[in-house]
Structure formats: C-alpha cells, structure tokens
Amino acid sequence: MDEQKSCRNKCIFCFIDQLPKGMRESLYFKDDDSRLSFLFGNYITLTNLTQHEIDRIIKMHISPINVSVHTTNPQLRCKMMHNRFAGDALRHLESFAKAGISLNCQIVACPGINDGDELLRTFTDLEKLGVNMTAVVPVGLTKYRQGLYPLTEYNQETAAQTLDIIEKFGDECVKKYGRRIFYAGDEFYIKANRPIPDPDFYEGFPAVEDGIGMIACLKEEIEFAVEDSEYNDALNYKVTMACGEAVAPYLRDMMKIIATKFPNIEINVVAIKNNFFGGGVNAVSYTHLRAHETD
C-alpha cells in the first residue's frame, strides 16, 4: 500500500491533539484512510474521499466501511470537525447504503453538543440508512487540553441521560429488526453507576474493540475458561494484577469467579490512578488490559 491518507479535520474532541509531547512519533499520526477501514477496522470521516475513491468502493463492494459520524446534522458536523466540507461528506453514507455497503458507525458523544436531541436525530437518520451497527462512546479528555475547545466530561447524571436515549432507541430497534444496532460504550455504564449488561445484550460483541461490551466479554471468557478447567489442588500461589481505576471493581468480581473453583489461588487487583493522561481518561483502564491479553 502506498502512503497512508492523513486526517484533514481538527475535531474538537480529537484525542491525538490532547497527547503530551515526547511520545513515539507514530502516536501523533492521524489516519483517515478508507483502505485501513476495510483492512483493520479503522474509522474514517469520509471528508478526504474523492469521487473516484467513492466509485471504486462501490464498484468493488468494499464492505464493511467504518465511519466516524458523530452527528448527521451537517452544520454541527462542520463545527465539531472544524472542516467546512464535513457536512457535505455525509451524502457518501447514503451512496454507500444504496450500494449495499455495510456501515459501522461511531459517535463520540460530547456533553451539550451532539447528545440529547441531536443524538436522537443522528440515530433516526442512521436507522433510515439501515446501518449495521453504531457505537456511542463518551469523549475522553486528558489534562493536556490547553488552547483546545472547552469540553466537559460526562458525570453520573448526564451519562445516565445519554444512556437512556441509547438504550431506548436500541430497544426499539430490537422490536423492529430483531437487532439492537445502537450500543453505548462501557464507560457510560461506569459513569452512570449502572450494571454492565449481560453478554446476550451485545449480540456477539460487534464493537468490542471500540469499548462496547468489553467488560461483559472478558467476564464471559473468564467464566468459560474456569468452566473448562479441571480443578487442581496443587495450584497454590498469589497473583497481583494492576489495572486502571475504572475497571478495578469489575475485575475484582471476575477474580471471585476464579477463586470459587481454585480457592488456593489468591488474586489481588490493584487499581492504578492514571496520572499520565489525567483522571478523566478511563478507557485505557480496561482497553489496554484487553489488548495485552491478545499480544
């Protein structure tokens, strides 16, 4: 593959813009390449696609395409992405949908900007397009936001309000189509202080790498692993597991599942405060755990 296409936007919530200096160079590259979307599941904004590329995707039926939508309000999308063409790029969604291209969508929800009524509008528009899946995750804010657009984090009340919208719309889709389609990131449940849904809720975990159902998926895997393991009283040791603050309570509960069958194994879960990015960044608390599990 030739040189990767970089992002032409300057989104108000961009995580890369919130990184400190001095990290490895590859972390600062903003990819926005449709080829990587198909090959590796990267999300693209559609703002740098040429008509030739659109035609090629449709002709070759390159599917699925993962799209960072954020909002279907053209004016608001331009504002959120600091790109005057961002609203016009939404028309590509309809072109892909008409061509039978499967669309997986992502929405980074920002309090008071693209949630509430705007989120309902986006859901309604995406439902009409027949998208395959839409993941909604809360904006992540680091302590390195000097000079950037003023954003606020979700608190328990606002997270619960947004979660209600997502779950209600998803419930309606289950009734109409037999599939949920619209999912909330695990962080919404954590911030709203609500229980993580059971694995069946996630219908095969279509967006687990986006933080959708990651906790439920890990718990299910542990349950299966324990069930398939034979009891061995010779297993007698202590383990210390370090993780982020957000996931620590859930991991402690999961370790009890192991202790039930292997009482001689003592697992101590230690929560580590994220001083590097700041306390507002919680996704890495369990996303990195999951990533290292597959290394």
Where are these regions (language model features)?
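Redox- and metal-dependent alpha/beta enzyme cores, enriched for Fe-S-associated oxidoreductases
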Residues: 236-286
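Short helix/loop capping segments that flank catalytic or ligand/cofactor-binding pockets
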Residues: 22-24, 145, 191-193, 250-252
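Flexible glycine/acidic-rich beta-alpha junction loops that bind and position SAM and/or redox cofactors
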Residues: 113, 130-157, 177-199, 273-279
